[in-house]
Amino acid sequence: MQQLQNIIETAFERRAEITPANADTVTREAVNQVISLLDSGALRVAEKIDGQWVTHQWLKKAVLLSFRINDNQVIEGAESRYFDKVPMKFADYDEARFQKEGFRVVPPAAVRQGAFIARNTVLMPSYVNIGAYVDEGTMVDTWATVGSCAQIGKNVHLSGGVGIGGVLEPLQANPTIIEDNCFIGARSEVVEGVIVEEGSVISMGVYIGQSTRIYDRETGEIHYGRVPAGSVVVSGNLPSKDGKYSLYCAVIVKKVDAKTRGKVGINELLRTID
């Protein structure tokens, strides 16, 4: 694996010179191998090690290099044709392969090659970009988008129209992460490497980036870039110091543990916020 990483790192330093016409065999094979490993879930761009999320930047570099070494090609669709550098994940799947993988894909859901989809996942008409990781038992609902290299945990529900941001550029940015057992409400956006920790519930229409204030009304604490585990979050506003205006924020209205979450429905958690 170290040899593979070294090839990617070296090639990335001269990426501006690489084209589909001049890409050498060693680089091309290394990049294709990484994309295949990401596609199968054997590698992932970010993983939790000793309780902390670690981003493997070299894997993101491999994804970026794939755009340098591959030319656009015609991609066949059910009702149309497309023209892109990245093939679709399910292009060569037959019924036996779908049965083996154990997930459902509802047309016209689109998943790019290099994204991993785990067993018991349901993809409604949605989009999953290259480098993303979608873990077991997750629902990606209609018109939801999972951005490049985003990490989605087990038993997550991404409601209709949800946007989970991708972070191939800038390269040093960490991927957006939704941990296990989270619910993200319809039309919400989580971007810029924000981490939504385990068991959190995000109401519909909540927008969270790195600069968004995440206000805990019980403690008065303000978080940036991280929704603490077990948070129930709605959209809100905080007043300016002079009281002349207010600015958007996300508000943690309560905290719930797994036991409470198991007994009480998501809608009930969001309705009883006073």
Swiss-Prot record:
It is found in: Cytoplasm. It comes from Shigella boydii serotype 18 (strain CDC 3083-94 / BS512). It is an enzyme of class 2 (transferase). It catalyses: (S)-2,3,4,5-tetrahydrodipicolinate + succinyl-CoA + H2O = (S)-2-succinylamino-6-oxoheptanedioate + CoA. GO terms for biological process: diaminopimelate biosynthetic process; lysine biosynthetic process via diaminopimelate. Pathway: Amino-acid biosynthesis; L-lysine biosynthesis via DAP pathway; LL-2,6-diaminopimelate from (S)-tetrahydrodipicolinate (succinylase route): step 1/3. The keyword Cytoplasm applies. Belongs to the transferase hexapeptide repeat family. One of its GO terms (cellular component) is cytoplasm. This is 2,3,4,5-tetrahydropyridine-2,6-dicarboxylate N-succinyltransferase. Keywords: Acyltransferase, Amino-acid biosynthesis, Cytoplasm, Diaminopimelate biosynthesis, Lysine biosynthesis, Repeat, Transferase. Its main location: cytoplasm. PANTHER family: 2,3,4,5-TETRAHYDROPYRIDINE-2,6-DICARBOXYLATE N-SUCCINYLTRANSFERASE, MOLYBDENUM COFACTOR GUANYLYLTRANSFERASE. Its EC number is 2.3.1.117. Pfam families: Hexapep_2, THDPS_N_2. GO terms for molecular function: 2,3,4,5-tetrahydropyridine-2,6-dicarboxylate N-succinyltransferase activity; nucleotidyltransferase activity.
